[in-house]
From Swiss-Prot:
Transmembrane segments: none annotated. It comes from Pseudomonas syringae pv. syringae (strain B728a). Converts GTP to 7,8-dihydroneopterin triphosphate. Keywords: Hydrolase. Belongs to the GTP cyclohydrolase IV family. InterPro entries: GTP_cyclohydrolase_FolE2, GTP_cyclohydrolase_FolE2/MptA. One of its GO terms (molecular function) is GTP cyclohydrolase I activity. This is GTP cyclohydrolase FolE2. It catalyses: GTP + H2O = 7,8-dihydroneopterin 3'-triphosphate + formate + H(+).
Length: 301
């Protein structure tokens, strides 16, 4: 005969009668499938999920209920705004005995997709984008934000100008006294000396967050990523040959940017497309031992 197991969450009262904003679990690992037309493979996600504990007399929530709901969701559902809303609502309903009224969850994962080389046909490689989905259920409504980290190259405009000045001075020193300059001679000199000075550039990261519409059929992650990469103009590459590396060098020269420029370009690209957006960029300076950073947001406080 099975003996009944004690459940102190039901039989005991907390000595401190205080309601709690959020209670739940962090870092639960599950495989998930995304509502993204171009992403067919499952991804490995870490999930945080909580409900409020409004009744101060209730000692604790039922974490196993949350876990089972998440496990079933990952097994049977594709992550989209409507399925996330259903999961969050079920989390609240599973804790009516705790007088819970709202729930939230965060999914963190790396989104892998193939990116083609700039020039070489048939050449591509995998690129990883760290993604976070923050979903909240309150008063019967879903609030969903997605954020993604996008890596790009930034070349300093000031350093480029200083490098051009040095090249100009070197060119004048070599050819300034000649009344006629042979174009072939100039071409040879440039081939050997155009790198007399080079501007500093560095790998950089833009963290972009946007509000996802409740009625959206998909998460729109690849749409967001493509939009930001097009705005910046210099996304880091995967597989390259020399022709692709040369094309990347040209893109860097055509898209010189301070950290301020990068933040403004991205936010401008987002305007009018999302109800709310924020941009945070970091340039991992090769000139300095510290980073340059800029932020902008139109989220309401």
């Amino acid at each position: 005969m099975n003996k009944p197991l004690p459940d102190v969450a039901l039989t005991e009262i907390s000595p401190a009668l205080v309601s709690l904003d959020w209670v739940g679990m962090q870092g639960v690992e599950v495989p998930i499938r995304l509502a993204e037309a171009s992403i067919r493979h499952p991804v490995h996600a870490h999930v945080d999920l909580q409900v409020d504990l409004a009744d101060p007399s209730v000692k604790g929530i039922h974490m196993s209920r949350l876990y089972r709901l998440l496990d079933g969701y990952a097994e049977r559902q594709i992550v989209s705004p409507d399925t996330l809303a259903a999961l969050l609502e079920a989390m609240v309903e599973s804790h009516l005995d705790c007088h819970s009224s709202h729930a939230r969850l965060t999914l963190s994962f790396n989104l892998l997709c193939r990116r083609p080389a700039l020039i070489t046909e048939g050449l591509s490689g995998w690129k990883s984008y760290p993604v976070k989905l923050d979903a909240t259920w309150h008063a019967g409504r879903l609030c969903l934000d997605s954020s993604v980290d996008i890596t790009y190259s930034s070349t300093c405009p000031c350093s480029a100008a200083l490098s051009r000045q040095l090249l100009e001075e070197a060119f004048a020193a070599r050819f300034g006294r000649q009344s006629f300059v042979d174009p072939m001679q100039v071409a040879t000199w440039l081939r050997e000396n155009a790198s007399f000075a080079t501007p500093h550039s560095q790998r950089s990261v833009a963290t972009v967050q946007v509000r996802v519409a409740e009625q959206a059929a998909e998460l729109g992650l690849m749409t967001l990523i493509d939009l930001v990469e097009q705005a910046l103009g210099t996304p880091v590459q995967t597989a390259v040959k020399r022709a692709d590396e040369q094309a990347f060098a040209r893109l860097n020269g055509q898209n010189l940017m301070y950290v301020e420029d990068a933040a403004r370009k991205v936010q401008q690209a987002l305007e009018g497309r999302y109800a709310a957006s924020s941009v945070s960029v970091r340039h991992f300076e090769s000139l300095h031992p510290h980073d340059a950073a800029a932020q902008t947001s139109n989220y309401l406080s």
